[in-house]
Amino acid sequence: MHNPILLTAICAVVSFFIGAIPFGLILGRVFNHTDIRKAGSGNIGTTNALRVAGPKVAALTLLLDCLKGAICILIARPLIADLGYGFPVSIMAPGAAGDWMLGVICLAAVWGHIFSPYLNFHGGKGIAVGLGVILAWYWPIGLSLLGMFIVAVAITKFVSVGSLAAAIGLPIAACAVFPYSSLGLKFCMAMIGITVVWAHRANIKKLMTGKESKLSFTKRVTEPDDK
């Protein structure tokens, strides 16, 4: 296939549906016979899986959500390279010809997770899948954002603060590291950050009102959080 727009569209659709797989919900049902949407924040991501179903389910959710994001990029990258853009695309993609294509695919995977068609277009908040796509896209930025997340959570004990810091840091890091990348790539990285921040709107409200739950590896919840 030598049509970049058609190839990008196909890869984006596939990535959207891969990103949409609700591993947190599936694992909660398999290991705990629990619908994690019915307790805690009601979210299907790692943090709520930890609060409702425990560390094992949370760890597997984190791993699989990261992997599904990474797989989308690892599959798409050689396909983009085969278009004939040349050697740099097959190695890095950021800052090279066709960089916008992987940007669109990154965005599609994150949107699939947040707006899962398997769950009536409700889903997670995009942090783990976002980490997966960014690590596969350009791992130094991914590791930098992971470090920022860990430091923010260690200081505040709020996972949401770390998530927001990483989301805001993504477009800044992408522009700083690849200032000459395409406008399309910059736009996609910005949209990932904006969407993840939007997905945390309830957390932002709780942080402002002092109702946000701090990270705990032992405390379990069985009822929905107060709004």
Give the residues covered by each predicted segment.
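Helix-coil boundary and interhelical linker segments in multi-pass alpha-helical membrane proteins
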Residues: 1-10, 74-104, 135-141, 176-188
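Interhelical loop and helix-boundary elements at the membrane-water interface
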Residues: 2, 18, 23-73, 114-127, ...
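Alpha-helical transmembrane segments of multi-pass membrane proteins, especially transporters
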Residues: 12, 16, 61-65, 69, ...
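Alpha-helical transmembrane segments of multi-pass membrane proteins
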Residues: 15-18, 77, 108-113, 149-153, ...
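Interfacial segments of multi-pass membrane proteins
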Residues: 50-54, 76-79, 108, 125-156, ...
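A cytosolic-side transmembrane-helix exit/cap motif
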Residues: 122, 146-150, 182-189, 206-213
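Long C-terminal subdomains/extensions of small-metabolite kinases
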Residues: 130, 177-178, 185-186, 190-198, ...
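Loop-to-transmembrane alpha-helix initiation sites
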Residues: 143, 159-166, 181-192
